[in-house]
Amino acid sequence: MRLRNNANAPLYLKSQEQYIVNDQQLLKNDLAKVFKNPHLPLHIEIGMGKGDFIVENALHNPQINYLGIEKFPTVIVKAHKKALKHKLDNLAMICFDANAILDLLNSKSIDKIYLNFSDPWPKKRHAKKRLTNPYFLEKFAALLKDDGLIEFKTDNESLFHYTIYDVLLNDLTKYEILFLTYNLYALVNNVELLKNIPTEYEKKFVMQGQRIKKVSFRFLKKND
């Protein structure tokens, strides 16, 4: 079910100081005003939804800073209210469109990017809007440190096939796949499942018996 638009969401976000980044320049120029320990590794989730994944990650991994990026104010309000139930020094959220992500973060500043259940944009003419399209991956590559990773999870068979075969395996000089599964929850006792933190969509899809696909990959450097 699509979340009903909250017309007051933008004003709510502007009034919040805990967890919400209202001055985007801080992420490039003064991380000490965003995180208590600004020198920790930084992981970002693009399209964080209602926040289940990123809040739980921040709770379980205090040695990592987490930034959730979500372009819909109504949705980020839900995530923010979940975060307020906890006292976290390593979590921040911002309402922002990933199309302009290079304006938000410094190059070579991110250790890991999470893409969870992104919009599949099924029509061919919309392929450039997919977050695993080379258009976006080039932006993400600029943000990631040399050993940085991308983790992508989806229930969508077509989007996963596109990501693997049309993008990652289509240019082996650019990408290296580190982990790949078409059925994450079938990997009993596998570390990838044991450490998995589900999103709100993921929980629903698993209950419906849908297979969760996952791939982790990195960008190859010229000397690799």
UniProtKB/Swiss-Prot annotation:
It catalyses: guanosine(46) in tRNA + S-adenosyl-L-methionine = N(7)-methylguanosine(46) in tRNA + S-adenosyl-L-homocysteine. It comes from the Bacteria. S-adenosyl-L-methionine binds at residues 45, 70, 97, 119. One of its GO terms (cellular component) is tRNA methyltransferase complex. The keyword Cell cycle does not apply. It is an enzyme of class 2 (transferase). Catalyzes the formation of N(7)-methylguanine at position 46 (m7G46) in tRNA. This is tRNA (guanine-N(7)-)-methyltransferase. It comes from Ureaplasma urealyticum serovar 10 (strain ATCC 33699 / Western).
